[in-house]
């Protein structure tokens, strides 16, 4: 069922949304089949562009620091059901144009890093690229959410180059350490189980686990710095020894 252009379109959509189940709303969003598929294809292209940028940065930094700052990169395209639900919840029309204009998180790239400092180094290098435009930045590492959630979120705009045009597309990029990602994944599974009541002691335990996760990140990063310092000193000592034991010039 496709919505027609008319002065009553908004009222008709609100009426439909108040009665349709989520699956049918999803079908409604996809009623503009070809334009919808094209738009999702553009978002997939944008995700590939961003993922490639981080793979290149990871390769460069691994040569510079002798380790990979990126543990893994995950991408996801928002499902039709989630798109429809978000448009409905925010009171936006169910159109392809509305998706592109009003939603920033259709395309998502999650970068899992070894240490918190890697997050900021990668984010800074990424944002310095001249074809990346920062639209929004939310630092939940410096200022965690009340439940303990930590991550760095960026909304960026990047071009994709098609055979006959260039399109600017928005992508949400999330940066987490391994422990941040582990906590967020398990918190989601625990909190969003069906029919689970809001339990204060569960929330407290989750928050305490988030604090422990943050402490673990800090301790592991401290150990990494100690190891790097020791390795640098050992390398300097070996170079000095080589110079002292070198052949004498007569």
Task: Identify what each model region corresponds to.
Residues 8, 15-19, 40-42, 69-75, ...:
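Glycine-rich, low-complexity intrinsically disordered segments
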Residues 41, 45, 78, 82, ...:
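Charged, alpha-helix-enriched surfaces in structured cytosolic catalytic cores
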Residues 42, 46-53, 65-66, 70, ...:
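A cross-family "folded-core" feature that marks the main globular domain of proteins
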Residues 100, 113-222:
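Long beta-strand-rich cores associated with HINT superfamily self-processing modules
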Residues 106-113:
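Terminal, regulation- and interaction-focused segments at domain boundaries
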